[in-house]
């Protein structure tokens, strides 16, 4: 049963592979880019808040004194 499913799947994938240039689906780089870009933005936002809040406090307290 399992082997017949594997054979059917590989028989279907072989003609598709000829037309797609050697791979089924999108490139690994595109997949990882879609996954990592939001995480990089979130990481940079958290890092900016953690490191930048003292500067923001200093800037806004200085602006109100003047």
Curated annotation (Swiss-Prot):
Its main location: mitochondrion. It is a single-pass membrane protein. GO terms for cellular component: mitochondrial inner membrane; mitochondrion; respiratory chain complex; respiratory chain complex IV. Residues 9-27 are mitochondrial matrix. Signal peptide: none annotated. The keyword Hydrolase does not apply. The chain crosses the membrane at residues 28-64. Residues 1-8 form a transit peptide. The keyword Protease does not apply. Belongs to the fungal cytochrome c oxidase subunit 26 family. Component of the cytochrome c oxidase, the last enzyme in the mitochondrial electron transport chain which drives oxidative phosphorylation. The respiratory chain contains 3 multisubunit complexes succinate dehydrogenase (complex II, CII), ubiquinol-cytochrome c oxidoreductase (cytochrome b-c1 complex, complex III, CIII) and cytochrome c oxidase (complex IV, CIV), that cooperate to transfer electrons derived from NADH and succinate to molecular oxygen, creating an electrochemical gradient over the inner membrane that drives transmembrane transport and the ATP synthase. Component of the cytochrome c oxidase (complex IV, CIV), a multisubunit enzyme composed of 12 subunits. The complex is composed of a catalytic core of 3 subunits COX1, COX2 and COX3, encoded in the mitochondrial DNA, and 9 supernumerary subunits COX4, COX5A (or COX5B), COX6, COX7, COX8, COX9, COX12, COX13 and COX26, which are encoded in the nuclear genome. This is Cytochrome c oxidase subunit 26, mitochondrial. The gene is COX26.
């Amino acid at each position: 049963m399992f082997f017949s499913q594997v054979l059917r799947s590989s028989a279907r994938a072989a003609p598709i592979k000829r037309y797609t240039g050697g791979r089924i689906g999108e490139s690994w780089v595109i997949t990882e880019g879609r996954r990592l870009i939001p995480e990089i933005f979130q990481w940079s936002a958290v890092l900016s808040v953690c490191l930048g809040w003292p500067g923001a406090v200093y800037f806004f307290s200085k602006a109100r004194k003047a």
